[in-house]
């Protein structure tokens, strides 16, 4: 429950910024003045990324100081661990990479405001389908830095350390189910608000923009078939990768097992992995982002968001699945993508459930 509350609190300022950005665009498109609301939008944006940049810079400075002062490192370690030996052992690997962690936080955070400049967005508009005058599009492209921060955080701490920390936490199945649904519902609602629901679009218009429709029997069949096909593609990828010496990363397997392994032991857990991720991620990525960011960039973001895989074979697999889902979105609609994504996850989950020795 505590983790879910924290997730909601972290999403709250992001909801506020996209809501204000949509209000600014609404006034602009209606011929009114949007400078005040746009200015307020960008001010909140600067506060969010400014705090991140300051925290990252502080961590970076502390890391530099600790390299020249052993006593400072020990004092900082004692402060964080509370004097416990086990906690100290868990924190020490993080402290060893504190400089990279700080840099990975402040550098993307400092870069994010650059996308608020119309001149920068004019150049981006040559590559992706955005309107450089739009406050919504300005916020959307700048929020890509959140994905970068998420990835650099994973790489800085290291998959091995994350796996160790995750294994030590041992969350209950109930809390995993609840937190996953909360996260994915927030993704879906954020996508709805981001494309103008509550401000520029009514409910039906928002669903139409996102490509969420009542699927036909043919679309359901195509979605399920695409999900099963994607499973086959990824299995072939893993076989080929292992044949050339690029197998699955042991730390990725450990981290995945600790994060979602408990869910694979029950049918409700497997259904949650399929339905929650299908609804939340597809509404955000294929529904909201792909029409503006395009197939390749959206698929890349989709892969990087799954930062628990670091940069490994699993990341490539997610990218390929993202491409398949993106092509499906271009040919059909987001609802079909939801079905395909859910079918893919549920199929993999059932394989792990029925044949645990294969994983």
Question: What kind of feature is each model-predicted range?
Answer:
Residues 45-61, 104-117, 146-157, 188-192:
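Alpha-helical transmembrane segments and immediately adjacent membrane-interfacial amphipathic helices
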Residues 66-71, 162-165:
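Intrinsic disorder/low-complexity segments
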Residues 1-39, 50-61, 66, 75-95, ...:
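Transmembrane helix-loop-helix hairpins at the membrane interface
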Residues 2-13, 43-45, 90-109, 176-189, ...:
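Alpha-helical transmembrane segments of polytopic membrane proteins
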Residues 13-26, 102-125, 190-203:
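Membrane-water interface of transmembrane alpha-helices
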């Amino acid at each position: 429950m505590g983790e879910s509350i924290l997730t909601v609190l972290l999403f709250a300022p992001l909801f506020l910024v996209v809501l204000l950005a949509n209000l600014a665009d609404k006034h602009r498109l209606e011929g009114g003045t949007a400078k005040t609301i746009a200015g307020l939008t960008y001010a909140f944006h600067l506060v969010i990324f400014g705090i991140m940049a300051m925290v990252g810079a502080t961590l970076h400075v502390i890391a530099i100081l600790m390299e020249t002062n052993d006593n400072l490192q020990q004092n900082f370690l004692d402060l964080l661990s509370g004097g416990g030996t086990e906690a100290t052992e868990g924190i020490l690997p993080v402290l060893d990479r504190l400089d990279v962690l700080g840099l990975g936080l402040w550098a993307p955070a400092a870069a994010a405001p650059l996308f608020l400049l119309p001149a920068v967005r004019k150049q981006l508009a040559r590559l992706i389908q955005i309107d450089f005058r739009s406050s919504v599009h300005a916020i959307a492209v700048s929020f890509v830095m959140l994905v970068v921060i998420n990835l650099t955080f994973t790489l800085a701490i290291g998959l091995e350390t994350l796996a160790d920390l995750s294994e030590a936490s041992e969350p209950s199945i109930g809390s995993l189910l609840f937190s996953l649904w909360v996260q994915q519902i927030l993704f879906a609602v954020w996508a709805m608000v981001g494309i103008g629901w509550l401000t520029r679009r009514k409910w039906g218009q928002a669903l139409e923009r996102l490509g969420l429709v009542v699927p036909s029997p043919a679309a359901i069949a195509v979605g399920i078939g695409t999900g099963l096909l994607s499973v086959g593609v990824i299995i072939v990828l893993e076989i080929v990768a292992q044949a050339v010496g690029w197998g699955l990363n042991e730390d990725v397997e450990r981290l995945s097992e600790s994060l979602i392994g408990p869910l694979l032991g029950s049918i409700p857990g497997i259904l949650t992995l399929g339905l929650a991720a299908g609804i939340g991620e597809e509404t955000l990525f294929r529904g909201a982002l792909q029409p503006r960011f395009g197939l390749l960039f959206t698929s890349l973001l989709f892969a990087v968001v799954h930062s628990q895989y670091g940069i490994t074979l699993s990341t490539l697999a997610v990218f390929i699945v993202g491409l398949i889902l993106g092509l499906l979105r271009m040919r059909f609609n987001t609802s079909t993508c939801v079905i395909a994504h859910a079918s893919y996850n549920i199929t993999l989950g059932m394989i792990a459930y029925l044949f645990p020795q294969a994983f």
